[in-house]
Structure formats: C-alpha cells, structure tokens
Amino acid sequence: MFIAINNTCHEQSTFSTYTSSGLVKNNLKESGFDYIKTKGFSKKRHMLSGNAVSKIKRNSLNKKVAVIGTGITGCTLSYMLAKKGIEVDLFEQSESICSGASSHELLVTYPRLSAHDSPFGRFNLQSYIYATNFYDNLETAAWKKTGVILLNHDESTQKRQSSLLEKRSDGEIYQYLNSDEASKISGIELKFNGLLYKDAGYILPNDLCRSLIDSPKINLFTSAEVKNISTMQDVTSFSVDEKIYEYEDVCLCTGSDTSKLLKIEGFNIKRGQVTHIETQDSILNINLPICAKGYISPQVNDLHIVGSSYSNEDHTKLTEEEHLSNLKNLKLIFDGDMVINSGKAGLRAVAKDHMPI
C-alpha cells in the first residue's frame, strides 16, 4: 500500500499520519518517504509528517488534454479538468455542441435503486447523490430541482417500491405518496400512488453544456470530425481534416459513435425516441416529471416531452410507430387526447446487459 501511495507522488508531495508506530515508520522508509516525528494531533502524543522522495515533477498546470464529444459527459469532464487548471481541447463533429444523445430538450434525472445491497444499487445511489449535489453547486438555471414522481403502476413496480420502503423509511432519498398526495404535488390528477424523489429533477442539456464549457481553459473546435486514433508509446494522435493532433491523454466521450473510433467488445447501441406533445389545459400545470411505463415532463416552450422508446434500430429518423408507443405508455399517467408537435431520436451506448456506457 505504501509503495502504491508513493507511485502517485511527485517531488512536492507531503503527508502526515495519525500513528507513529514502528510498523508504519519502517514501511514509509522502505517505500521511499522521508519523515520526522512531531507532536500529535489533539491528545495524541506523536505523529509523523514528511515528504515523498520522488523525482516526478508536478506538471498538471501545463498539461493539455483532448476531449472528443460535447454531450453531457464531454462537457462535464472538460469542466472538471479546467477546474483543476488543465487546458482542454474539446472537439465536436457537428456545427454546434450537444448534437448526439444529449440533444434532447430536457433529460430527467433520477435513480434506479435496489433494496438489495448490491454493487449496482450502491453505484446508482452514489451516482444520483453526486449528480444532484454537482448540479446544485453549479447554481445554473439549466438544472430544475423539481423532484420526480415514480408511479406504482403494476405488480413489478409494487414489489420494487414496497421493498425500497421496507429498506428505508426516513424520507431522505424517497418518500411514499398516496394518489391524492401525488396529484397535489404533480399538478395533475393521478390514479396511482408512488415514490417522490425530492432531490431529483431535470436538466436542459444544451444550456447546461454551454455553461460548463464557458472557461478560458477550454478551447472548442466544432465541425471537427476526429479520425484515425492511434497510440504510440505515451502519445495518442488523431486527425481532423487531415491535420494531426497529438496529446498525452485523449478522452472519448462519443457515446454511440465510439465504436466507429475504436474496436470495443460488448458495445451495443439502443435507439431512443421522445415525442413532443402540445400543452393543453389538462396538463399545463404539471410541475415535475412523472414516470410510469413512460414519462411526461413539465412544459418547456409550450411542449411536453414524452418518452422514451428503447429499440434495436440504428437510425435517428422519427417513426410514427415509436410516437404511438410513447403515447400508449403515457396513458398510465394521462389518458386524454394529445397532439403531437414533433420529436427527437438518439442512439444510446450500452453494454449487453443494458448498463449505460
């Protein structure tokens, strides 16, 4: 462990310890650390402090990284790198950002949790908490922390929600709503009970991504289709319009296009189409996303987003079949007449077990 720590250090790395035991001192010395024994913290008599004996120079301030793709992943990664003082060259194959699966009018953010203590359940819970805190701290109007209601609409959902409520009843992550409570909170009459995820909501991806990459550390290249990625020793190169770019680190945030750039095992594409319906008096007051077999959003620019299909098709043309499927699923939430205005389709990158990539 001490060797692994030393391998991550540079010439200015320092450390301190709680303990000053012989075991720790011997391991520090053998693993390439210099130390001194000093007064301990609080009531502790002694502690150790020192530095790593390393010739590795700190170079992150002069580092430049290439990020390919300007969806939520690419823009968020660019933002995080820029916050660390790292310059980013951000490449987008289209004329404007968010041209792929992140191009939808809005994206609903909530977790798929498990009552069982599984890696999948823990990952989803921690991802959800991290994401909502991240969006909160951005203080951006592109994040709408409205809450999200998941309706208890069939036997499978009933079993899952009952298990979740048995596992956790403190209301911190989710809370039970009867149909009257769900109707009052959502702004529309609902016939099912369900769970409210109070810290969930939805994002406006285009606005969010523009705010994330608004930094002097981020250089945006649009209409820049990346080709011919190759790595030799510590340098990765690729071409854009026959010009060669070279970097120590290249990050592919390219979603369903990734398989065009690299050979990846177990990489699948799943199509998703959303339907934009015109608002009307009966749904005008919906003020948070409501999910059942499908979902409906609050109105954005006089439209509600209804989704989403999940098919094996590999194109992004709108189909009447998937529009009708979305509207059929919506009937569990709202069973009135709807007028289709438009829609949008994108391609998801998923593993064979449907986990997102």
Which positions does each model-derived feature cover?
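Short beta-strand to alpha-helix junction loop
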Residues: F15-S16, P119-S127, H153-T157, L195-S211, ...
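N-terminal Rossmann-like FAD-binding beta1-loop-alpha1 element of flavoenzymes
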Residues: N62-L90
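Glycine-rich FAD pyrophosphate-binding loop
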Residues: K83-S103
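Helical element adjacent to the flavin cofactor pocket in flavoenzyme catalytic cores
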Residues: L195-V240, Y245, D249, C253, ...
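Dinucleotide-binding Rossmann-like beta1-alpha1 core, especially the glycine-rich loop
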Residues: L106-I185
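Flavin (FAD/FMN) cofactor-binding core of flavoprotein oxidoreductases
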Residues: H153-D154, E181, K328-I357
